């Protein structure tokens, strides 16, 4: 995963990273050698990130850093749900917003068991209480299908499944 928000991506700051591979060995890589793209890092699919060294980007006073943290936190507080979620579910397609496409289908509030499309931001699925992984995946499947059927846009998941691929989950 190459996490990002508000115009920046995590991998832009990585100097090096250490992965724990499935066979138990450690793999270290320089940031510039990572295969990254929008919300993805190929190497992170092969192993688990144990640590990363980040590079600083300029110098700011402690007060300026605190002001920017507070500003970003307020923007998130104003635009994202407060319930438990995994963050944005789908990647934004070219020239559009996944949340806008989902909202156009009237899917805010759509539920499956304890999982529900957020009323605050349609690209979030929130846990209203006791949601299982299968309920969340089922709701993701339903939302993806409704958007595809109405607009022709196939939304791609941004979140990572553990233990199986999205291809398996969608079939």
Residue ranges and their predicted role:
Residues 1-15:
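A gly/ser-rich beta-alpha-beta helix-loop segment of oxidoreductase catalytic cores
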Residues 20-138, 145-171:
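Phosphate/pyrophosphate- and phosphate-bearing ligand-binding catalytic cores of soluble enzymes
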């Amino acid at each position: 995963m190459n996490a990002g928000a508000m115009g920046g991506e995590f991998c832009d700051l990585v100097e090096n990273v250490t992965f724990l591979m499935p066979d138990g060995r450690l793999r270290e890589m320089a940031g510039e050698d990572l295969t990254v793209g929008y919300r993805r890092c190929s190497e992170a699919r092969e192993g688990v990130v144990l640590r990363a060294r980040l590079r600083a980007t300029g110098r700011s006073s402690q007060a300026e850093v605190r002001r920017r943290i507070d500003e970003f936190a307020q923007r998130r507080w104003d635009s994202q749900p407060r319930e438990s979620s995994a963050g944005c579910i789908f990647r934004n397609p070219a020239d559009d917003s996944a949340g806008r496409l989902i909202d156009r289908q009237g899917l805010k509030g759509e539920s499956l068991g304890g999982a529900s499309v957020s009323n605050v931001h349609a690209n979030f699925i929130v846990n209203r209480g006791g949601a299982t992984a299968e309920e969340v995946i089922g709701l993701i499947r339903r939302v993806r299908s409704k958007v595809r059927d109405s607009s022709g846009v196939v939304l791609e998941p941004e979140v990572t499944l553990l233990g199986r691929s999205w291809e398996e989950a969608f079939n």
